[in-house]
UniProtKB/Swiss-Prot annotation:
GO terms for molecular function: N-acyltransferase activity. It comes from Pseudomonas putida (strain W619). Its EC number is 2.3.1.191. The gene is lpxD. InterPro entries: Hexapep (IPR001451), Hexapep_transf_CS (IPR018357), LpxD (IPR007691), Trimer_LpxA-like_sf (IPR011004), UDP_GlcNAc_AcTrfase_non-rep (IPR020573). This is UDP-3-O-acylglucosamine N-acyltransferase. Belongs to the transferase hexapeptide repeat family. LpxD subfamily. The lineage of its organism: Bacteria, Pseudomonadati, Pseudomonadota, Gammaproteobacteria, Pseudomonadales. It catalyses: a UDP-3-O-[(3R)-3-hydroxyacyl]-alpha-D-glucosamine + a (3R)-hydroxyacyl-[ACP] = a UDP-2-N,3-O-bis[(3R)-3-hydroxyacyl]-alpha-D-glucosamine + holo-[ACP] + H(+). Homotrimer. Keywords: Acyltransferase, Lipid A biosynthesis, Lipid biosynthesis, Lipid metabolism, Repeat, Transferase.
Amino acid sequence: MTVTMTLGQLAEALGATLKGSEALQITGLATLQEAGPGQLSFLANKQYRKYLDNCQAAAVLLQAADAEGFAGNALIVADPYLAYARISHLFDPKPKAVAGIHPSAVVAEDAQVDASASIGPFVVIESGARIGANVSIGAHCVIGARCVVGEGGWLAPRVTLYHDVTIGKRVVIQSGAVIGGEGFGFANEKGVWRKIAQIGGVTIGDDVEIGVNTAVDRGALSDTRIADGVKLDNQIQIAHNVQIGEHTAMAACVGISGSTRIGKHCTIAGGVGMVGHIDVCDNVFVSGMTMVTRSITEPGAYSSGTAMQPLADWRKSAARIRQLDDMSKRLQQLEKRVDTVTSGGQPTSEG
């Protein structure tokens, strides 16, 4: 699919100040280094400023300060990256869904499917499920009993919703994601694990995005809950009973253990692990590969990772870490000797 828009149309859509030809035709988007005639680019990170002067793009999204002295066409905006995000959808080549149910789909008699929904090949929709207006469900998806998929939802091929999953409006779920699988619940009886039925569900708010091969387990008793605007990257594990607050984002390979509660507007970087039954307050940033073992009660940035260094240096550091306990004991002994010498053998005023 090829889309062509004029620079003037894009300026109007963004509320941008136009510098250059209003009639200039734009056919796509590209980076500053790769853009050519007909393509629009953007400068959002100052480290790429060096590519601007030699950029071959038809036009560039710029802040006012960067537009000064720039000889080419520009759309001047307060936030070039946000402007790029907004117009990226205008040039998205993703095929548009067509309303209707594919003949190979299996839909339970009592399931409700809105006439405007698109149900792809070999989809299974089980008893009591409800599919809202303008929903797109890709090939080989399974929608379990009594599930609800809200208006404008988009499920890529091979998404699985177990029974009793409720999804809000405009939710995007990528291929391989499994929502509502049984949580990891077992009771130990004299060394033997006895399974606990997971009788809760999953509730997902509006405008949530869930990445490829991410798993969100159903609750043991009450629902696992993901609030409005949450963004989950690929290969994330959300265990049973977890609660995630509005507009929190998690990068790939995060693991959240059962019954942990995460607040609003948090950013959890890649590979973070959180133990179960802890609380994380609003507005927290956790750096990549951090292991969170206790509740976080104050907003701010947190890390437990070790920064990269040359291997030989890291080995020396690791060896010193093993010696810390012994070094601490030796330091305490040295402090006692210094105390004795400086006090003339008499007890100090501190005891």
